[in-house]
Curated annotation (Swiss-Prot):
The gene is queA. GO terms for biological process: queuosine biosynthetic process; tRNA wobble guanine modification. One of its GO terms (cellular component) is cytoplasm. InterPro entries: QueA (IPR003699), QueA_dom1 (IPR042118), QueA_dom2 (IPR042119), QueA_sf (IPR036100). This is S-adenosylmethionine:tRNA ribosyltransferase-isomerase. Belongs to the QueA family. It is found in: Cytoplasm. Its EC number is 2.4.99.17.
Amino acid sequence: MLTLSDFDFDLPPELIAQTALPERSASRLLEVDNTNPSAPPRLIDRRFAELPACVAPGDLLVFNDTKVLKARFFGRKASGGKIEVLIERVTGERIALAQIRASKSPPPGTTLTLADAFDVTVGERVEPFFTLHFPDNCLVLIERHGRLPLPPYIEHAPDAADETRYQTVFAANPGAVAAPTAGLHFDDAVLAALEARGVERATLTLHVGAGTFQPVRVENLAEHRMHSESYELTDALVEKIAATRARGGRVIAVGTTSMRALEAAARDAQAAGRPLAATRAETDIFITPGYRFRVVDRLVTNFHLPKSTLLMLVSAFAGIETIRAAYRHAIDARYRFFSYGDAMLLTRRDDAAEATHGGA
C-alpha cells in the first residue's frame, strides 16, 4: 500500500516561482510521452506556446472558468482585537463561509469589522468554517474591499500584476479562493492557434477552495479527509465530450480542477447507472494510484507540492515512476514550480496503477 512518504521529494526553494512571467505562454511545457509501457517516458522540453502542436484536430480541451475572489480580509473585533478572514465560499447573496484567524474564536452574534469598510455578523459554525452575514451583496463587497489570496508559498503581498496574472483570461464565474493554475498559461494567441488547428474547447466551473493547499497529515492515505468543492457541468460540455468520443478525439483536462470535476461527475453517474449528464454538485473525490479514469485522456497541469493530493492525482493518471522521472528532470532542468510555475502535458496510462489504494 502506498503511503504519504511515497509522494515526497526535495525541491530547491529557488525553483518555487514567486511571480508570473511577463508573457503567459512564455512558460515552459514538459511534454511527457509515456505511451510505450516497455520504455522509460520520453521527456520533451517545450515552450507553452507550442501546445497546439502537441494536440490533434478533433481533440477537446476542457477549461475551468472559475474566477478568483479577493477573499482575504484583515479586520478587528469590537474589542479591537485583530482578525484575519479568508472567505471559503459564497453560499447566498449576503452569506459566506469563512476561515477566521483570531486570538479566540468569535461566538455567534459577534460583529467583525472588515477592511475598515463594513461589518459582518458571525453566524453558526459549519466546521471548519464560520458563517458570515454581510450587510449587502457578498460578491460586490468582496471585490471592492478584499485582497487577492495568493498561495502561502508566494512571499510577496498581492499587487496589481497579481490581480491580472492570478486570473485566467477566460475566468467568468466568481467563487474560487485559488486559481486553476494550469489555465494561467493560456493567452489569446494560444487559444487562437488551438482553434485554427481544429481543437474544440469547452468549460466547466469548479470553485477551488482553500483546501487545495491543505497538507496531508496522515501517513496512511486512507485516513485523509479530502476537502469538498462545488462544481457544475453543462449540457453543452457533456454533448461536446460525447461528440469527441464519437470522432475518436481525446478529452484533455486543463488542470487538476477540471479533472476532478469531470471524473467526479462520471464516477457518480456510473454509480447511479446513468450516462454522464449536466450536473451541479459537491465533490470530495480523492484520486490516488489505482483509480480508474473514466473521462480524461490527457492533462495539462503545473508542478505540484511534495506530499500533496494533486501530486497523488497526477501519479494516478500517468504512473508513479513516470511522474518521479518527470519531476527529477524538471528539477535538474530548473523548471519553475507551483502556481506561477511551468506546466506539464501528461497522457493517461491505463496501467498506471503500479500500486493501488482504494481505486473505484
